[in-house]
Amino acid sequence: MARIAGINIPDHKHAVIALTSIYGVGKTRSKAILAAAGIAEDVKISELSEGQIDTLRDEVAKFVVEGDLRREISMSIKRLMDLGCYRGLRHRRGLPVRGQRTKTNARTRKGPRKPIKK
């Protein structure tokens, strides 16, 4: 297994799909990385040489991925919460942030229903 950005990339998958196992790399970014590295999308990871894997590592290193991306996102949310702005309050209360209705629906964000105690 090739190791890129601290993640074991599955060998049996095509390069485009295999790179999406890295947090922060979707299909579009995966295609861009492969184009910059000069590698075909339909090649399996097991068929790549060490040199090609090294170029993939270098291309992935140009982006914010994995732990750094997770940290950046959590710091952004924490900043909103510390500011006390509307979006920060919604994050703090565990409610939808982007204006969705909450009288009905929003169950994913609010969690399971709590029974009314009599």
Swiss-Prot record:
Belongs to the universal ribosomal protein uS13 family. GO terms for cellular component: cytoplasm; cytosol; cytosolic small ribosomal subunit; small ribosomal subunit. The gene is rpsM. It comes from the Bacteria. Located at the top of the head of the 30S subunit, it contacts several helices of the 16S rRNA. This is Small ribosomal subunit protein uS13. Residues 94-118 are annotated as: Disordered. GO terms for molecular function: rRNA binding; structural constituent of ribosome; tRNA binding. Changing N105K: In PW097; partially suppresses a rimM deletion. Keywords: Ribonucleoprotein, Ribosomal protein, RNA-binding, rRNA-binding, tRNA-binding. Pfam families: Ribosomal_S13 (PF00416). It comes from Escherichia coli (strain K12). Part of the 30S ribosomal subunit. Forms a loose heterodimer with protein S19. Cross-links to the P site tRNA and weakly to the A site tRNA. Forms two bridges to the 50S subunit in the 70S ribosome, contacting the 16S rRNA and proteins S19 and L5. One of its GO terms (biological process) is cytoplasmic translation. NCBIfam families: uS13_bact (TIGR03631).
